[in-house]
Amino acid sequence: MQAIKCVVVGDGAVGKTCLLISYTTNAFPGEYIPTVFDNYSANVMVDGKPVNLGLWDTAGQEDYDRLRPLSYPQTDVFLICFSLVSPASFENVRAKWYPEVRHHCPHTPILLVGTKLDLRDDKDTIERLRDKKLAPITYPQGLAMAREIGSVKYLECSALTQRGLKTVFDEAIRAVLCPPPVKKPGKKCTVF
């Protein structure tokens, strides 16, 4: 059975642990407890192939910036996560997570994952964001970011309702088993 190491990164509180717990146990966890490091393992079938999927959770908080990369060696695929209702976490994909992952693992495939899909249409959440002159991240915005960082796929999911959840991990496995041609991140040409 092929073993695949999948490391999940992203800002604190975007839902990385909930994503993993909901996927591996079919239950949504209760309160928020920041992660240091956790590993989960799941035996799954994708396209008729059995795979042992090793899932590595990481801490998004800055305090762990020096510790986190210790989980990066031998990673087969990264999930860079952001919350669809946190524009700051979305901006950090470009500012922090993509550069960090690429620095340590220049050729490892990346999937960009928008979490908390159930909250994008939630009236209270939209209202809270509007009060700060912000709005949830749209699908086209996520897709544009995925293209910019050369992500293999852009996916959205909800760990609470499990909508799109299985697809995230199936596509992560496919990115390793049948790698697409290498995409270079979009380069911008500026003429003065």
UniProtKB/Swiss-Prot annotation:
Highest taxon listed in the record's lineage: Eukaryota
Cellular localization per UniProt: Cytoplasm; Endomembrane system; Cell projection, Lamellipodium; Cytoplasm, Perinuclear region
PTM info: (Microbial infection) Glycosylated at Tyr-32 by Photorhabdus asymbiotica toxin PAU_02230. Mono-O-GlcNAcylation by PAU_02230 inhibits downstream signaling by an impaired interaction with diverse regulator and effector proteins of Rac and leads to actin disassembly.
Known tissue expression: Highest levels in brain, also detected in heart, placenta and pancreas.
Induction details: Expression down-regulated in quiescent fibroblasts and clearly induced by serum stimulation.
Catalytic activity: GTP + H2O = GDP + phosphate + H(+)
Residue ranges of the motif Effector region: 32-40
Key word Lipoprotein present: yes
Pfam family, one: Ras
Disulfide links within the chain: none
InterPro entries for this protein: P-loop_NTPase, Small_GTP-bd, Small_GTPase, Small_GTPase_Rho
Sites of the Glycyl lysine isopeptide (Lys-Gly) (interchain with G-Cter in ubiquitin) crosslink: 166
Assigned GO CC terms: cell periphery; cytoplasmic vesicle; cytoskeleton; cytosol; endomembrane system; endoplasmic reticulum membrane; extracellular exosome; filamentous actin
GO BP, one annotated term: positive regulation of cell adhesion mediated by integrin
Enzyme nomenclature, EC number: 3.6.5.2
S-geranylgeranyl cysteine: lipidated positions: 189
Propeptide residue interval(s): 190-192
Residues that, per the record, bind GTP: 10-17, 57-61, 115-118
Function: Plasma membrane-associated small GTPase which cycles between an active GTP-bound and inactive GDP-bound state. In active state binds to a variety of effector proteins to regulate cellular responses, such as cell spreading and the formation of actin-based protusions including lamellipodia and membrane ruffles. Promotes cell adhesion and spreading on fibrinogen in a CIB1 and alpha-IIb/beta3 integrin-mediated manner.
Illness the protein is tied to: Neurodevelopmental disorder with structural brain anomalies and dysmorphic facies: An autosomal dominant neurodevelopmental disorder characterized by global developmental delay, severe intellectual disability, poor language, seizures, dysmorphic features, and thin corpus callosum.
PANTHER family: RHO FAMILY GTPASE
Listed NCBIfam families: small_GTP
Protein name (database record): Ras-related C3 botulinum toxin substrate 3
Organism of origin: Homo sapiens
Taxonomic lineage of the native organism: Eukaryota, Metazoa, Chordata, Craniata, Vertebrata
